[in-house]
């Protein structure tokens, strides 16, 4: 499947993500246990990463940069897949990982320094994507990253992908986009890039 002519992006959207949604539903209804869910999720993440490395090398690299941060264990798989998809369509994509258990009084400064070091001087669009199903880390990350808006040469966008329970709260956080759907987030990210090209042409 990985070496077929099927779009690698479509493999992730049409096969991997629906499978994970089904597994989540089965777990919530008690049809599978925690270890079975973990095994399937880990296998799906392995597939996503393999898709990244067998993806076409002919994709044009865009002047578009994204750092993806997970704020909860449950959102990690979506964050990893988002990173792979953006890589496959030509973005410079960085996946920081999950920070759910890393927060301390100085960690906000640590994240700000990292993002500034990696992305503040690049030319083009920069998008920071926050994936979190945890109210505390979602608030922490959005507040931490919003303070960087004035430190970037180019355009900086902040997007949040969360669950239905936290969607309303995320919409009140003064970020550029909020959603519960990975497909919607990717489409919004593409549209922001197209708009940035038009604005700078």
Where are these regions (language model features)?
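Peripheral docking tails and interdomain loops at the edges
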Residues: 157-201
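Short beta-strand/loop segments at the ligand-binding rim of alpha/beta enzyme cores
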Residues: 148-159
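Generic structural signal for well-ordered alpha-helices
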Residues: 142-146
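Short, well-ordered coil/turn elements that cap or connect secondary structure elements
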Residues: 88, 123, 153-155, 172-173
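Conserved mid-sequence domains
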Residues: 46-141
């Amino acid at each position: 499947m990985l070496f077929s002519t099927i779009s690698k992006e479509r493999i992730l959207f049409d096969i991997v993500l629906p499978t994970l949604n089904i597994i989540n539903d089965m777990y919530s209804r008690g049809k599978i246990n925690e270890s079975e869910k973990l095994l399937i999720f880990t296998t799906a993440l392995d597939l996503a990463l393999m898709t990244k490395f067998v993806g076409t090398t002919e994709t044009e690299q865009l002047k578009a940069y994204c750092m993806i941060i997970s704020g909860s264990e449950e959102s990690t798989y979506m964050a990893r897949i988002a990173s792979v998809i953006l890589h496959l369509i030509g973005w410079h994509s960085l996946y920081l990982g999950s920070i759910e258990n890393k927060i301390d009084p100085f960690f906000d400064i640590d994240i700000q320094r990292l993002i500034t070091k990696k992305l503040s001087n690049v030319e083009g669009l920069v998008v920071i994507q926050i994936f979190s199903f945890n109210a505390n880390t979602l608030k922490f990350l959005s507040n931490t990253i919003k303070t960087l808006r004035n430190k970037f040469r180019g355009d900086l966008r902040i997007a949040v992908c969360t669950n239905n329970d936290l969607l309303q709260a995320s919409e009140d956080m003064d970020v550029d986009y909020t959603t519960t759907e990975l497909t919607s987030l990717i489409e919004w990210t593409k549209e922001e890039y197209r708009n940035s090209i038009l604005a700078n042409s």
